[in-house]
């Protein structure tokens, strides 16, 4: 049961990271070079 929970959390984190990366690639180049900018926008969109 605990292994299943870990797998679920890992999948959720990977999905979230992918969503943030996707949002970042959508932004202007000067924003893409700034992880803080990308991360901020990703969280806001999410």
From Swiss-Prot:
The keyword Amino-acid biosynthesis appears for this protein: no
GO molecular function, a single term: toxin activity
Organism: Doratifera vulnerans (Mottled cup moth)
Entry GO terms, CC: extracellular region
Superkingdom of this protein's organism: Eukaryota
Keyword Transmembrane helix: no
Chain's role: Probable toxin. Does not show insecticidal, antimicrobial and antiparasitic activities. Does not induce increase in intracellular calcium in mouse DRG neurons, suggesting that it does not induce pain.
UniProt keyword list: Secreted, Signal, Toxin
Family the entry assigns: Belongs to the limacoditoxin-6 family.
Signal peptide: 1-19
Tissue expression: Expressed by the venom secretory cell of the spine. The spine is a cuticular structure containing a single large nucleated venom-secreting cell at its base. It is an independent unit capable of producing, storing and injecting venom. On the back of D.vulnerans caterpillars, spines are grouped together by 50 to 100 to form scoli, of which there are eight in D.vulnerans.
Compartmental location: Secreted
Annotated protein name in UniProt: U-limacoditoxin(6)-Dv61
